[in-house]
Amino acid sequence: MPNPANSKKLSRSRSAAFTRQAGRCFYCGCAMWLGDPSTFYQAHKLRPKQAKVLQCTGEHLLAKQDGGTESPDNIAAACALCNHRRHKRKSPPAPDAYASFVRKRIARHAWHAPWVFEKGLVP
């Protein structure tokens, strides 16, 4: 059963990471939203479904199963797409290795859907 105290701590750490990273994904560098998505999708002329993949998630740099905590130094802000794809793998790669892999794909416009690049959401 989830611990409400841990959930609250993760939420605070995610928010701190979002601010520290200037609202950009740790892996792909894409702009993200935290809280109410409507301001984000209206500002970038997106459909709500499009904005969903750019929702800020709290990414454990050291997985909880490996002893990671919800402390701010172990949480990075990652877009939902990057977080999902990292953990969909059989063995999630180390954060730095995954970031390098993602950035190479971003450079080829081969990670996010074309509209992300067209809207200028990736630096």
Task: Name the predicted role of every residue range.
Residues M1, A99-P123:
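Short, intrinsically disordered terminal segments enriched in charged and Pro/Gly residues
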Residues M1-Q42:
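Short, charged surface segments at domain edges that flank catalytic/cofactor-binding sites
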Residues G23-R24, T57, A78:
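The −1 position to Zn-ligating cysteines in a subset of zinc-ribbon hairpins
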Residues A31, K64, L81-R85:
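Cys/His-rich metal-chelating microdomains
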Residues M32-I75, K90:
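Histidine-centered nuclease catalytic patch
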Residues Q42-H44, P95-Y98:
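Glycine-rich, phosphate-binding/catalytic loops in enzymes
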Residues T57-E59, H87-P95, A107-P114:
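Short C-terminal domain-edge/linker segments immediately following a structured domain
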Residues I75-A97:
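Short Cys/His-centered divalent metal-binding micro-motifs
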